[in-house]
Amino acid sequence: MFQYEELNKQFIGGKWQEGSSPNVLENKNPYTQKTFTTFRKATADDVDEAYRAAALAKKKWDAVNPFEKRTILEKAVTYIEENEEAIIYLIMEELGGTRLKAAFEIGLVKNIIKEAATFPIRMEGKILPSTIDGKENRLYRVPAGVVGVISPFNFPFFLSMKSVAPALGAGNGVVLKPHEETPICGGTLIAKIFENAGIPAGLLNVVVTDIAEIGDSFVEHPVPRIISFTGSTKVGSYIGQLAMKHFKKPLLELGGNSAFIVLEDADIEYAVNAAVFSRFTHQGQICMSANRVLVHSSIYDKFLELYQAKVESLKVGDPMDPDTIIGPLINSRQTDGLMKTVEQAIEEGAVPVKLGGFNGTIVEPTILKDVKPFMSIAKEELFGPVVSFMKFDSEDEAVDIANETPFGLSGAVHTSNLERGVAFAKRIETGMIHVNDTTINDEPNVAFGGEKQSGLGRLNGEWSLEEFTTLKWISVQHEKRSFPY
Protein backbone atom coordinates (compact mmCIF):
# COMPACT_ATOMS: atom_id res chain seq x y z
CA MET A 1 0.00 0.00 0.00
CA PHE A 2 1.26 3.47 -0.82
CA GLN A 3 0.43 6.93 0.44
CA TYR A 4 0.00 10.03 -1.70
CA GLU A 5 2.72 11.77 0.25
CA GLU A 6 5.18 9.52 -1.59
CA LEU A 7 3.92 10.68 -4.98
CA ASN A 8 4.52 14.44 -4.83
CA LYS A 9 7.76 14.56 -6.80
CA GLN A 10 8.91 14.47 -10.39
CA PHE A 11 9.81 11.07 -11.82
CA ILE A 12 12.75 11.53 -14.20
CA GLY A 13 15.33 9.00 -15.31
CA GLY A 14 13.97 6.43 -12.87
CA LYS A 15 14.45 8.74 -9.87
CA TRP A 16 12.00 10.63 -7.69
CA GLN A 17 13.21 14.21 -7.41
CA GLU A 18 12.00 17.72 -6.69
CA GLY A 19 11.18 20.00 -9.59
CA SER A 20 13.83 22.63 -10.31
CA SER A 21 11.44 25.55 -10.00
CA PRO A 22 11.08 27.41 -6.70
CA ASN A 23 7.36 27.69 -7.50
CA VAL A 24 4.94 25.31 -5.83
CA LEU A 25 1.85 23.63 -7.23
CA GLU A 26 -0.84 23.02 -4.62
CA ASN A 27 -2.86 19.84 -5.01
CA LYS A 28 -6.34 20.51 -3.62
CA ASN A 29 -9.34 18.35 -2.89
CA PRO A 30 -12.03 19.91 -5.14
CA TYR A 31 -14.79 19.22 -2.61
CA THR A 32 -13.15 20.47 0.60
CA GLN A 33 -10.74 22.87 -1.16
CA LYS A 34 -8.04 21.73 1.26
CA THR A 35 -4.48 21.30 0.00
CA PHE A 36 -3.43 17.71 0.68
CA THR A 37 0.01 17.80 -0.92
CA THR A 38 2.31 20.10 -2.90
CA PHE A 39 4.78 19.78 -5.77
CA ARG A 40 7.83 21.79 -6.69
CA LYS A 41 7.13 22.48 -10.36
CA ALA A 42 9.22 21.09 -13.18
CA THR A 43 11.05 23.54 -15.43
CA ALA A 44 11.98 23.40 -19.11
CA ASP A 45 15.33 21.95 -18.01
CA ASP A 46 13.50 19.14 -16.22
CA VAL A 47 11.47 18.49 -19.38
CA ASP A 48 14.71 18.29 -21.34
CA GLU A 49 16.17 15.83 -18.84
CA ALA A 50 13.03 13.71 -19.01
CA TYR A 51 12.99 13.51 -22.80
CA ARG A 52 16.68 12.65 -22.98
CA ALA A 53 16.21 9.95 -20.35
CA ALA A 54 13.33 8.48 -22.35
CA ALA A 55 15.37 8.42 -25.55
CA LEU A 56 18.24 6.65 -23.81
CA ALA A 57 16.02 4.11 -22.04
CA LYS A 58 14.14 3.37 -25.25
CA LYS A 59 17.34 1.83 -26.65
CA LYS A 60 17.47 -0.53 -23.66
CA TRP A 61 13.77 -1.33 -24.11
CA ASP A 62 14.50 -2.31 -27.72
CA ALA A 63 16.73 -5.12 -26.45
CA VAL A 64 14.15 -6.59 -24.07
CA ASN A 65 12.46 -9.77 -25.28
CA PRO A 66 8.85 -9.09 -26.42
CA PHE A 67 7.48 -11.71 -24.04
CA GLU A 68 9.33 -10.09 -21.14
CA LYS A 69 7.81 -6.74 -22.12
CA ARG A 70 4.39 -8.37 -21.99
CA THR A 71 5.12 -9.74 -18.52
CA ILE A 72 6.18 -6.30 -17.26
CA LEU A 73 2.94 -4.72 -18.47
CA GLU A 74 0.93 -7.53 -16.90
CA LYS A 75 2.71 -6.84 -13.59
CA ALA A 76 1.36 -3.29 -13.78
CA VAL A 77 -2.18 -4.70 -13.76
CA THR A 78 -1.36 -6.89 -10.77
CA TYR A 79 -0.02 -3.89 -8.85
CA ILE A 80 -3.22 -1.94 -9.53
CA GLU A 81 -5.34 -4.85 -8.32
CA GLU A 82 -3.28 -5.13 -5.14
CA ASN A 83 -3.69 -1.40 -4.43
CA GLU A 84 -7.18 -0.84 -5.79
CA GLU A 85 -8.70 0.54 -2.61
CA ALA A 86 -5.89 3.09 -2.23
CA ILE A 87 -6.32 4.17 -5.85
CA ILE A 88 -10.07 4.56 -5.38
CA TYR A 89 -9.34 6.88 -2.45
CA LEU A 90 -6.88 8.92 -4.53
CA ILE A 91 -9.46 9.41 -7.29
CA MET A 92 -12.04 10.59 -4.76
CA GLU A 93 -9.52 12.83 -2.99
CA GLU A 94 -7.79 14.44 -5.95
CA LEU A 95 -10.50 14.92 -8.56
CA GLY A 96 -13.76 14.54 -6.66
CA GLY A 97 -14.74 11.33 -8.36
CA THR A 98 -17.37 9.24 -6.64
CA ARG A 99 -16.62 5.68 -5.55
CA LEU A 100 -18.69 4.45 -8.48
CA LYS A 101 -16.70 6.58 -10.91
CA ALA A 102 -13.38 5.52 -9.38
CA ALA A 103 -14.16 1.82 -9.75
CA PHE A 104 -15.32 2.43 -13.33
CA GLU A 105 -12.10 4.28 -14.18
CA ILE A 106 -9.86 1.62 -12.65
CA GLY A 107 -11.62 -1.04 -14.72
CA LEU A 108 -10.90 0.94 -17.88
CA VAL A 109 -7.25 1.31 -16.89
CA LYS A 110 -6.75 -2.40 -16.30
CA ASN A 111 -8.36 -3.26 -19.63
CA ILE A 112 -6.21 -0.85 -21.64
CA ILE A 113 -3.00 -2.17 -20.04
CA LYS A 114 -4.05 -5.75 -20.76
CA GLU A 115 -4.56 -4.80 -24.41
CA ALA A 116 -1.24 -2.94 -24.53
CA ALA A 117 0.51 -5.99 -23.04
CA THR A 118 -0.20 -7.82 -26.30
CA PHE A 119 1.52 -5.17 -28.43
CA PRO A 120 5.11 -6.43 -28.05
CA ILE A 121 4.14 -9.71 -29.73
CA ARG A 122 2.02 -7.99 -32.39
CA MET A 123 4.82 -5.97 -33.99
CA GLU A 124 4.30 -7.75 -37.29
CA GLY A 125 5.89 -6.92 -40.61
CA LYS A 126 5.32 -7.95 -44.21
CA ILE A 127 7.27 -9.31 -47.11
CA LEU A 128 6.08 -7.77 -50.37
CA PRO A 129 6.83 -8.63 -53.99
CA SER A 130 8.99 -6.39 -56.14
CA THR A 131 8.87 -5.22 -59.73
CA ILE A 132 12.62 -5.85 -59.85
CA ASP A 133 13.91 -9.38 -60.32
CA GLY A 134 15.75 -10.89 -57.36
CA LYS A 135 14.56 -8.23 -54.94
CA GLU A 136 12.78 -8.76 -51.62
CA ASN A 137 10.80 -5.97 -49.94
CA ARG A 138 10.54 -6.20 -46.18
CA LEU A 139 8.24 -3.95 -44.18
CA TYR A 140 9.03 -3.69 -40.47
CA ARG A 141 6.77 -2.18 -37.83
CA VAL A 142 9.01 -0.27 -35.42
CA PRO A 143 8.47 2.06 -32.44
CA ALA A 144 8.04 5.74 -33.26
CA GLY A 145 10.68 6.67 -30.68
CA VAL A 146 9.61 8.86 -27.76
CA VAL A 147 6.02 9.95 -27.14
CA GLY A 148 4.98 13.07 -25.24
CA VAL A 149 1.62 12.65 -23.47
CA ILE A 150 -0.50 15.51 -22.11
CA SER A 151 -3.54 14.36 -20.17
CA PRO A 152 -6.69 16.05 -18.77
CA PHE A 153 -8.25 16.31 -15.32
CA ASN A 154 -11.55 14.47 -15.78
CA PHE A 155 -10.46 10.83 -16.14
CA PRO A 156 -6.74 11.39 -15.52
CA PHE A 157 -5.78 7.86 -14.53
CA PHE A 158 -7.41 6.33 -17.59
CA LEU A 159 -6.80 9.05 -20.15
CA SER A 160 -3.10 9.15 -19.28
CA MET A 161 -2.87 5.36 -19.39
CA LYS A 162 -4.79 5.26 -22.69
CA SER A 163 -1.66 6.67 -24.37
CA VAL A 164 1.09 5.65 -21.94
CA ALA A 165 0.46 1.89 -21.86
CA PRO A 166 0.07 1.42 -25.65
CA ALA A 167 3.10 3.64 -26.30
CA LEU A 168 5.21 1.53 -23.94
CA GLY A 169 3.80 -1.69 -25.33
CA ALA A 170 4.70 -0.58 -28.84
CA GLY A 171 8.30 -0.07 -27.75
CA ASN A 172 8.49 3.68 -27.14
CA GLY A 173 9.87 5.86 -24.39
CA VAL A 174 7.32 8.20 -22.80
CA VAL A 175 7.26 11.57 -21.07
CA LEU A 176 3.93 12.31 -19.39
CA LYS A 177 2.68 15.72 -18.32
CA PRO A 178 -0.52 15.33 -16.30
CA HIS A 179 -2.99 18.16 -15.83
CA GLU A 180 -1.91 20.39 -12.96
CA GLU A 181 -5.24 19.72 -11.16
CA THR A 182 -4.61 15.96 -11.11
CA PRO A 183 -0.84 15.40 -10.95
CA ILE A 184 -1.03 12.18 -8.95
CA CYS A 185 -3.86 10.21 -10.58
CA GLY A 186 -2.81 11.42 -14.01
CA GLY A 187 0.92 11.25 -13.48
CA THR A 188 2.98 10.09 -10.53
CA LEU A 189 0.64 7.22 -9.66
CA ILE A 190 1.28 5.84 -13.14
CA ALA A 191 5.02 6.26 -12.65
CA LYS A 192 4.77 4.33 -9.38
CA ILE A 193 2.86 1.51 -11.08
CA PHE A 194 5.36 1.02 -13.88
CA GLU A 195 8.35 1.50 -11.60
CA ASN A 196 7.03 -1.37 -9.53
CA ALA A 197 6.36 -3.43 -12.67
CA GLY A 198 10.04 -3.20 -13.61
CA ILE A 199 10.36 -1.05 -16.72
CA PRO A 200 13.88 0.25 -17.46
CA ALA A 201 14.79 3.42 -15.57
CA GLY A 202 13.97 6.46 -17.69
CA LEU A 203 11.56 4.71 -20.07
CA LEU A 204 8.62 6.52 -18.45
CA ASN A 205 9.07 10.00 -17.01
CA VAL A 206 6.50 12.25 -15.36
CA VAL A 207 6.85 16.03 -15.18
CA VAL A 208 4.40 17.92 -12.98
CA THR A 209 4.19 21.57 -13.93
CA ASP A 210 2.12 24.10 -15.85
CA ILE A 211 2.42 26.10 -19.05
CA ALA A 212 3.42 29.25 -17.17
CA GLU A 213 6.54 27.38 -16.05
CA ILE A 214 7.57 25.51 -19.21
CA GLY A 215 5.92 27.39 -22.09
CA ASP A 216 5.85 25.35 -25.30
CA SER A 217 8.97 23.34 -24.50
CA PHE A 218 7.09 20.09 -23.93
CA VAL A 219 5.85 20.07 -27.54
CA GLU A 220 8.78 21.84 -29.21
CA HIS A 221 11.51 19.65 -27.70
CA PRO A 222 13.45 17.86 -30.48
CA VAL A 223 13.20 14.36 -28.99
CA PRO A 224 9.50 13.35 -29.14
CA ARG A 225 8.13 12.12 -32.47
CA ILE A 226 4.51 12.02 -31.32
CA ILE A 227 2.50 14.33 -29.07
CA SER A 228 -0.65 12.71 -27.69
CA PHE A 229 -3.01 15.30 -26.21
CA THR A 230 -6.39 14.86 -24.56
CA GLY A 231 -8.27 18.00 -23.60
CA SER A 232 -10.18 20.96 -24.98
CA THR A 233 -10.49 21.68 -28.68
CA LYS A 234 -9.08 25.18 -28.24
CA VAL A 235 -5.86 23.97 -26.61
CA GLY A 236 -5.70 20.90 -28.84
CA SER A 237 -5.81 23.04 -31.95
CA TYR A 238 -2.82 25.03 -30.70
CA ILE A 239 -0.86 21.93 -29.72
CA GLY A 240 -1.64 20.20 -33.01
CA GLN A 241 -0.40 23.16 -35.04
CA LEU A 242 2.71 23.51 -32.86
CA ALA A 243 3.50 19.80 -33.21
CA MET A 244 3.10 19.87 -36.98
CA LYS A 245 5.31 22.95 -37.20
CA HIS A 246 8.08 20.83 -35.71
CA PHE A 247 7.22 17.74 -37.81
CA LYS A 248 5.76 15.75 -34.94
CA LYS A 249 2.61 13.68 -35.31
CA PRO A 250 -0.26 14.98 -33.15
CA LEU A 251 -2.82 12.58 -31.71
CA LEU A 252 -5.73 14.68 -30.50
CA GLU A 253 -8.69 13.53 -28.38
CA LEU A 254 -10.69 16.73 -27.97
CA GLY A 255 -14.08 18.12 -27.00
CA GLY A 256 -17.53 16.79 -27.70
CA ASN A 257 -21.16 17.85 -27.84
CA SER A 258 -22.89 14.50 -27.97
CA ALA A 259 -26.55 14.15 -28.89
CA PHE A 260 -28.69 11.48 -27.23
CA ILE A 261 -31.53 10.91 -29.69
CA VAL A 262 -34.81 9.23 -28.77
CA LEU A 263 -37.00 8.11 -31.67
CA GLU A 264 -40.76 7.72 -31.21
CA ASP A 265 -40.60 3.89 -30.97
CA ALA A 266 -37.97 3.78 -28.22
CA ASP A 267 -38.37 2.00 -24.89
CA ILE A 268 -38.90 5.21 -22.93
CA GLU A 269 -37.99 4.04 -19.43
CA TYR A 270 -34.84 2.29 -20.63
CA ALA A 271 -33.86 5.30 -22.72
CA VAL A 272 -34.36 7.61 -19.72
CA ASN A 273 -31.94 5.55 -17.62
CA ALA A 274 -29.36 5.54 -20.42
CA ALA A 275 -29.78 9.28 -21.00
CA VAL A 276 -29.32 10.17 -17.33
CA PHE A 277 -26.19 8.01 -17.13
CA SER A 278 -24.94 9.65 -20.34
CA ARG A 279 -25.20 13.12 -18.82
CA PHE A 280 -24.46 12.91 -15.11
CA THR A 281 -21.65 10.36 -14.81
CA HIS A 282 -18.74 12.16 -13.12
CA GLN A 283 -20.82 15.34 -12.93
CA GLY A 284 -20.95 15.54 -16.73
CA GLN A 285 -17.18 16.07 -16.94
CA ILE A 286 -16.71 13.61 -19.80
CA CYS A 287 -16.05 14.48 -23.43
CA MET A 288 -18.63 11.88 -24.52
CA SER A 289 -21.37 13.13 -22.18
CA ALA A 290 -24.80 13.75 -23.67
CA ASN A 291 -25.01 17.54 -23.61
CA ARG A 292 -28.11 17.47 -25.80
CA VAL A 293 -31.11 15.16 -25.47
CA LEU A 294 -33.19 15.14 -28.66
CA VAL A 295 -36.65 13.60 -28.25
CA HIS A 296 -39.43 13.00 -30.79
CA SER A 297 -42.29 15.43 -30.20
CA SER A 298 -44.85 12.62 -29.67
CA ILE A 299 -43.06 11.39 -26.52
CA TYR A 300 -41.23 14.57 -25.52
CA ASP A 301 -43.33 15.50 -22.47
CA LYS A 302 -43.51 11.96 -21.11
CA PHE A 303 -39.77 11.42 -21.55
CA LEU A 304 -38.92 14.74 -19.91
CA GLU A 305 -41.18 13.96 -16.95
CA LEU A 306 -39.50 10.59 -16.32
CA TYR A 307 -36.05 12.07 -16.90
CA GLN A 308 -36.61 14.79 -14.33
CA ALA A 309 -37.86 12.27 -11.78
CA LYS A 310 -34.77 10.13 -12.30
CA VAL A 311 -32.45 13.12 -11.94
CA GLU A 312 -34.20 14.24 -8.75
CA SER A 313 -33.25 10.89 -7.21
CA LEU A 314 -29.51 11.42 -7.70
CA LYS A 315 -27.58 12.30 -4.55
CA VAL A 316 -25.34 15.36 -4.84
CA GLY A 317 -22.41 16.17 -2.57
CA ASP A 318 -19.42 14.55 -0.90
CA PRO A 319 -17.73 12.07 -3.25
CA MET A 320 -16.51 10.10 -0.23
CA ASP A 321 -20.15 9.19 0.50
CA PRO A 322 -20.75 5.88 -1.34
CA ASP A 323 -24.31 6.97 -2.18
CA THR A 324 -23.20 10.15 -3.97
CA ILE A 325 -23.67 10.17 -7.74
CA ILE A 326 -22.86 13.82 -8.47
CA GLY A 327 -19.75 15.19 -6.79
CA PRO A 328 -17.84 18.45 -7.26
CA LEU A 329 -16.51 20.03 -10.42
CA ILE A 330 -12.73 20.17 -10.56
CA ASN A 331 -12.46 23.88 -9.64
CA SER A 332 -14.43 27.10 -9.24
CA ARG A 333 -13.47 28.32 -12.73
CA GLN A 334 -15.44 25.45 -14.21
CA THR A 335 -18.37 26.29 -11.93
CA ASP A 336 -18.35 29.97 -12.89
CA GLY A 337 -18.19 29.19 -16.59
CA LEU A 338 -21.07 26.73 -16.37
CA MET A 339 -23.20 29.22 -14.43
CA LYS A 340 -22.70 31.86 -17.12
CA THR A 341 -23.62 29.36 -19.83
CA VAL A 342 -26.89 28.51 -18.07
CA GLU A 343 -27.75 32.18 -17.53
CA GLN A 344 -27.11 32.96 -21.19
CA ALA A 345 -29.24 30.03 -22.32
CA ILE A 346 -32.19 31.26 -20.27
CA GLU A 347 -31.73 34.76 -21.68
CA GLU A 348 -31.84 33.25 -25.19
CA GLY A 349 -35.13 31.48 -24.47
CA ALA A 350 -34.33 28.11 -22.91
CA VAL A 351 -36.87 27.11 -20.26
CA PRO A 352 -35.56 25.76 -16.94
CA VAL A 353 -37.39 22.60 -15.88
CA LYS A 354 -35.03 22.14 -12.96
CA LEU A 355 -32.62 24.91 -12.02
CA GLY A 356 -29.91 23.55 -9.78
CA GLY A 357 -28.02 25.61 -7.25
CA PHE A 358 -24.32 26.49 -7.40
CA ASN A 359 -22.31 26.26 -4.19
CA GLY A 360 -18.55 26.38 -4.54
CA THR A 361 -17.63 23.46 -6.78
CA ILE A 362 -20.91 21.66 -6.17
CA VAL A 363 -23.44 22.15 -8.94
CA GLU A 364 -26.88 20.61 -8.67
CA PRO A 365 -28.42 19.21 -11.86
CA THR A 366 -30.00 21.71 -14.24
CA ILE A 367 -32.46 20.66 -16.96
CA LEU A 368 -33.32 23.12 -19.72
CA LYS A 369 -36.08 22.42 -22.23
CA ASP A 370 -37.08 23.93 -25.57
CA VAL A 371 -33.45 24.61 -26.41
CA LYS A 372 -32.95 25.63 -30.05
CA PRO A 373 -29.95 24.84 -32.27
CA PHE A 374 -29.01 28.53 -32.57
CA MET A 375 -28.56 28.93 -28.80
CA SER A 376 -25.00 29.04 -27.52
CA ILE A 377 -25.63 26.21 -25.06
CA ALA A 378 -26.54 23.91 -27.96
CA LYS A 379 -23.24 24.60 -29.71
CA GLU A 380 -20.80 24.34 -26.81
CA GLU A 381 -19.32 21.48 -24.83
CA LEU A 382 -20.85 21.38 -21.34
CA PHE A 383 -18.51 20.12 -18.63
CA GLY A 384 -20.95 19.84 -15.75
CA PRO A 385 -24.39 18.54 -14.69
CA VAL A 386 -26.43 20.66 -17.11
CA VAL A 387 -28.50 19.19 -19.93
CA SER A 388 -30.38 20.67 -22.90
CA PHE A 389 -33.62 19.15 -24.21
CA MET A 390 -34.55 19.63 -27.85
CA LYS A 391 -37.65 18.50 -29.75
CA PHE A 392 -37.91 17.10 -33.29
CA ASP A 393 -40.72 15.90 -35.56
CA SER A 394 -38.86 13.75 -38.09
CA GLU A 395 -35.67 11.75 -38.51
CA ASP A 396 -34.34 14.28 -40.99
CA GLU A 397 -34.85 17.09 -38.49
CA ALA A 398 -33.14 15.07 -35.74
CA VAL A 399 -30.16 14.41 -37.99
CA ASP A 400 -29.87 18.09 -38.87
CA ILE A 401 -30.00 19.15 -35.22
CA ALA A 402 -27.51 16.50 -34.10
CA ASN A 403 -25.03 17.49 -36.81
CA GLU A 404 -25.37 21.24 -36.23
CA THR A 405 -22.23 21.45 -34.10
CA PRO A 406 -18.51 21.79 -34.80
CA PHE A 407 -17.90 18.68 -32.69
CA GLY A 408 -18.23 15.05 -33.76
CA LEU A 409 -17.20 12.70 -30.98
CA SER A 410 -19.97 10.43 -29.73
CA GLY A 411 -23.72 10.00 -29.67
CA ALA A 412 -26.58 7.58 -29.05
CA VAL A 413 -29.88 6.74 -30.72
CA HIS A 414 -32.73 4.78 -29.14
CA THR A 415 -35.33 2.86 -31.11
CA SER A 416 -37.11 -0.51 -30.97
CA ASN A 417 -35.95 -1.20 -34.54
CA LEU A 418 -32.22 -1.91 -34.35
CA GLU A 419 -31.56 -1.70 -38.08
CA ARG A 420 -33.42 1.59 -38.21
CA GLY A 421 -31.11 2.73 -35.44
CA VAL A 422 -28.01 1.67 -37.37
CA ALA A 423 -29.22 3.41 -40.54
CA PHE A 424 -29.89 6.56 -38.49
CA ALA A 425 -26.50 6.32 -36.75
CA LYS A 426 -24.70 6.27 -40.09
CA ARG A 427 -26.09 9.75 -40.83
CA ILE A 428 -24.65 11.31 -37.67
CA GLU A 429 -21.26 13.00 -38.17
CA THR A 430 -19.39 11.45 -35.25
CA GLY A 431 -16.51 9.06 -34.83
CA MET A 432 -18.66 6.91 -32.53
CA ILE A 433 -22.37 6.43 -31.95
CA HIS A 434 -24.26 3.76 -30.05
CA VAL A 435 -27.67 2.20 -30.69
CA ASN A 436 -29.77 1.65 -27.55
CA ASP A 437 -26.88 2.48 -25.24
CA THR A 438 -25.25 5.47 -23.57
CA THR A 439 -23.03 8.01 -25.28
CA ILE A 440 -20.22 7.02 -22.89
CA ASN A 441 -18.41 3.99 -24.27
CA ASP A 442 -14.75 3.04 -24.45
CA GLU A 443 -13.48 -0.47 -25.11
CA PRO A 444 -9.81 -1.45 -25.31
CA ASN A 445 -10.08 -3.21 -28.68
CA VAL A 446 -12.36 -0.78 -30.55
CA ALA A 447 -11.33 2.37 -32.44
CA PHE A 448 -11.93 5.50 -30.33
CA GLY A 449 -11.82 9.00 -31.76
CA GLY A 450 -13.80 11.89 -33.17
CA GLU A 451 -14.61 13.70 -36.36
CA LYS A 452 -14.61 17.44 -37.10
CA GLN A 453 -13.23 19.44 -34.16
CA SER A 454 -13.30 16.46 -31.81
CA GLY A 455 -9.85 15.26 -32.73
CA LEU A 456 -7.37 13.56 -35.03
CA GLY A 457 -6.43 9.89 -35.01
CA ARG A 458 -7.84 6.80 -33.36
CA LEU A 459 -6.77 5.02 -30.17
CA ASN A 460 -7.32 1.54 -28.68
CA GLY A 461 -6.50 -1.88 -30.06
CA GLU A 462 -4.79 -2.15 -33.42
CA TRP A 463 -5.32 1.58 -33.99
CA SER A 464 -3.12 2.50 -31.02
CA LEU A 465 -0.52 0.05 -32.27
CA GLU A 466 -0.52 1.82 -35.63
CA GLU A 467 -0.50 5.32 -34.13
CA PHE A 468 2.49 4.69 -31.83
CA THR A 469 4.62 2.91 -34.43
CA THR A 470 5.95 3.59 -37.89
CA LEU A 471 6.76 1.41 -40.90
CA LYS A 472 10.29 0.91 -42.16
CA TRP A 473 10.95 -0.47 -45.65
CA ILE A 474 14.12 -2.52 -46.02
CA SER A 475 14.77 -4.04 -49.41
CA VAL A 476 17.19 -6.88 -50.07
CA GLN A 477 18.64 -7.32 -53.56
CA HIS A 478 19.43 -11.06 -53.63
CA GLU A 479 20.70 -11.00 -57.19
CA LYS A 480 22.75 -8.38 -58.92
CA ARG A 481 20.54 -6.10 -60.98
CA SER A 482 21.39 -4.22 -64.13
CA PHE A 483 21.50 -0.43 -64.22
CA PRO A 484 20.91 1.81 -67.24
CA TYR A 485 24.40 3.35 -66.95
Curated annotation (Swiss-Prot):
Binding site for NAD(+): 231-236
Catalysed transformations (reactions): benzaldehyde + NAD(+) + H2O = benzoate + NADH + 2 H(+); vanillin + NAD(+) + H2O = vanillate + NADH + 2 H(+)
Superkingdom classification of source: Bacteria
Listed PROSITE patterns: ALDEHYDE_DEHYDR_GLU
InterPro entries associated with the record: Ald_DH/histidinol_DH, Ald_DH_C, Ald_DH_CS_GLU, Ald_DH_N, Aldehyde_DH_dom
Top-tier EC class: oxidoreductase
Induction: Transcriptionally regulated by SigD; part of the yfmT/yfmS operon.
pH dependence (UniProt free text): Optimum pH is 7.0.
Enzyme Commission identifier(s): 1.2.1.28, 1.2.1.67
CDD domains hit by this protein: ALDH_HBenzADH (cd07151)
A single GO molecular function term of this UniProt record: vanillin dehydrogenase activity
Intrachain S-S bonds: none
Temperature remarks: Optimum temperature is 37-40 degrees Celsius.
Keyword list, A-Z: NAD, Oxidoreductase
SUPFAM superfamilies the record matches: ALDH-like
Keyword presence, Ribonucleoprotein: no
List of catalytic residues: 253, 287
Phenotypic effect of disruption: Loss of conversion of vanillin to vanillic acid.
Main function: A benzaldehyde dehydrogenase able to act on substrates with 3- and 4-hydroxy and methoxy substitutions; converts vanillin (4-hydroxy-3-methoxybenzaldehyde) to vanillic acid in vitro. The physiological substrate is unknown.
Family: Belongs to the aldehyde dehydrogenase family.
Name under which the protein is recorded: Benzaldehyde dehydrogenase YfmT
Naturally occurring in which organism (per UniProt): Bacillus subtilis (strain 168)
Gene: yfmT
